[in-house]
Swiss-Prot record:
This is Peptide deformylase. The keyword Translocase does not apply. Fe cation binds at residues 92, 134, 138. The active site is at 135. Disulfide bonds: none annotated. It catalyses: N-terminal N-formyl-L-methionyl-[peptide] + H2O = N-terminal L-methionyl-[peptide] + formate.
Amino acid sequence: MALLPILEFPDARLRTVAKPVEQVDERVRAIIDDMFETMYDAPGIGLAATQVNVHEQIIVIDISENHDEPLVFINPRIDVLDETLFDYEEGCLSVPGFYEEVTRPRHVRVTALNRDGEEFVLEPEGLLAVCIQHEIDHLKGKLFVDYVSNIKRQRIRKKLEKQHKERA
């Protein structure tokens, strides 16, 4: 396993729309393993392949305190089950150090493939539903900062660009 570099906003590669995984094989499972290692090391609770410059529809999530409930979503499809919206303060490994409230559906249904290529359906609510929606957005080239005002987004962009220059 290997730690993968995480792309940071405003990197244009984060806007790439991910392609479906055609076959779940050892190559894909190796990407998944590297993504989990990278996510846990960051530390984070979710990571989309787009964030590590792999433009395939792969998501890893683990919202547990002890990192013992890993979830893999390959080629996820999402349906809203409850139109009730709620606000949740979100952060992102690709937008480090920033947290903003985002409004999302409370209850969704996700259909995806697991790490063995088997289809499954999950109907999460709360934090897991938010996390899945956030990561699926990454696969579509969308970031949580797209949900905030243009002024806030530009402020975040400028601060991160300044940090990138200071690290260079």
